[in-house]
Amino acid sequence: MDSIGCASTQIDSDTDGISDANPEGLTTATGKWANAFQARLVNQGLTCHVKNGDEFTIAMLEKHVWICAFMLVGASHGGCTVGEVESTYTKEFEALASEMMTAGAAALNVDVADGYLDRLKAYARAVSHFPTAVKEFEWRNGWFYKLTCDAVKAGREDPMPLHTQALYDLKLPLPIAWIN
């Protein structure tokens, strides 16, 4: 089976994943067809980088932490915009994103370069109007929640207590089967 993996950050045609911290854009692809995919995007005036191995995994993890942490903090504050999270709740975002990045990097066995919080916040400024909500739980925050459940089942402490508490505070229907 042939496949392509993408870590795309395009929300609007005018941002294309470009931020003040990443003027080269953030859209990233990997896999057998990554170069063909990149060519199609570039042909349409968009950016795309081909990355493999840990380099792609790190790009994917940063994107995943971005969407999960910004959405969770925003939802915790009435569904405010990404820009409001970045400007008003920045310390809360930084604490949550830091614990998620640490746990995610450990689970994926990668080292994320310093400055990731600045990169994540810069992208938020580029799409500041984007609304927040916790959606697609199984594929987004659910991945982090599963890391927590696995740790607890193994007799270890919750690696992301801020994340877990925020999920509980929102009264989300969390999958109990993951805990047992």
Segments from the language model and where they lie:
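Helix-loop-beta segment of a Rossmann-like dinucleotide-binding subdomain
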Residues: 5-25, 77-86, 124-132
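Active-site-proximal catalytic alpha-helix in oxidoreductases
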Residues: 55-99
